[in-house]
Each structure stands twice: as C-alpha cells, then as structure tokens.
Amino acid sequence: IHHQQKQKSSMKKAVILGVGPEAGLGSQLALRFAREGMHVLVASRTPSALEKLVPKIRESGGEATAVPTDATNEEQVVSLFENAGADLEVAVYNAGNNHPGRIVEMDTEYFENSWRVCCLGGFLFGREAVKRMLPKKKGTLIFTGASASLRGRANFGAFNSAKSGLRTLAQAMSKEYGPEGIHVALSLIHI
C-alpha cells in the first residue's frame, strides 16, 4: 500500500482551469490528460461542472481532483497550484466570458469583468504555474485564445480587448520563460 501511495503522489499532474460543459474544451482536455496517465486537477467556479467531470474521469480509470476556483481570486488560484505541488507538468487556462454587448451600452463593471476573467485570471494562473515549473526547468503552459485575440468584432469589444491582452501576456511569458525550459503557448480556438 505504501508503494501505491508513493506512486500516486508522484504522478505527473495537469491543472485545467475553465472546465465547463462535458463536451467543452476544458472537460475534454481533462479526460485526455487523465487517459495519458496524469492526475488532473480540474478547476471551475461552477461546482456542478466539477461534480459531473471528476466521477467520469475516475470511472475511466483516471485520477482527478476537483478544486473550485474563481480565476479572478488570487488566493484561490494560489491554492489551486499548491494542490498541484511539484509534479506539475501541464497547465491550461481556459477561462473566459464571451458575452456580446455594444460598447456604448457597457458599464465599467461589464468591461472590467471581461478583462478580469480573460486577462487578469490568465496572469494569476500563468504566474503560479511558472513558479512551480521553474525549479525543474520544464513544463507546458497553454492559454486558450479565440479569433477575438487577433481582431476586433462588433458587439464583442470587451471580450476582444481581454483576449488580445491574454495573447500578448502569453507572448511575453513565452519570451521570458522559454529560454528556461518552460513552453508557453496561446492556442487559438475558432468555432
């Protein structure tokens, strides 16, 4: 039993923040990483998404831990990565809030909330992931972007600005930490 416990605690880990519907990208990545033999820490501000996903991963023979996390809450993001420990291999930031609205009808709270989830949350997540990867000088950090990361679109001004900020954050982190063995990428998702 002691050998099995030691083996489980030293499993490579993946952290995925932004787990929503079962058919969504975050959930599908969690299932894939679990199939690859990783212990997956799934995080979402929506507990019901976690309650559905974790049993599914375990039923398929994988290891998963649910960690309710608000991407914009620094303490919760730090705690998420403390749960991952030193065995962190992959971190995926998939949080977003794509709600349309005309700019002249937006209030500051609406605009700021989009920025906080897409950009500030990405900063908190990326910073904490890289802190845990640097001692080993290896790891992969992936941010999910969208076509909004590259160009503006009518009625999506808040989302466009937030996602383009996330894109340039990923570029900066790639240039800072790539030479130290940390692979940082922004994957553009276009449906």
Model-assigned labels for residue ranges:
Residues 12, 62-63, 87-88, 133-146, ...:
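Active-site loop of short-chain dehydrogenase/reductase
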Residues 190-191:
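Conserved small/polar residues in nucleotide/adenosyl-binding loops
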Residues 38-52:
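Conserved glycine-rich Rossmann-like NAD(P)H-binding loop of the short-chain dehydrogenase/reductase
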Residues 11-41:
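Canonical Rossmann dinucleotide-binding motif of NAD(H)/NADP(H)-dependent dehydrogenases/reductases
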Residues 97, 104-123, 142, 166:
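Catalytic Tyr-X3-Lys loop
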Residues 18-20, 140-165, 171, 175-178:
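Catalytic loop of short-chain dehydrogenase/reductase
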Residues 126-127, 171:
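A short, exposed helix-loop element centered on a Lys and neighboring polar residues
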Residues 48, 68-79, 108:
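The beta1-alpha1 cofactor-binding region of Rossmann-like NAD(H)/NADP(H)-dependent oxidoreductases
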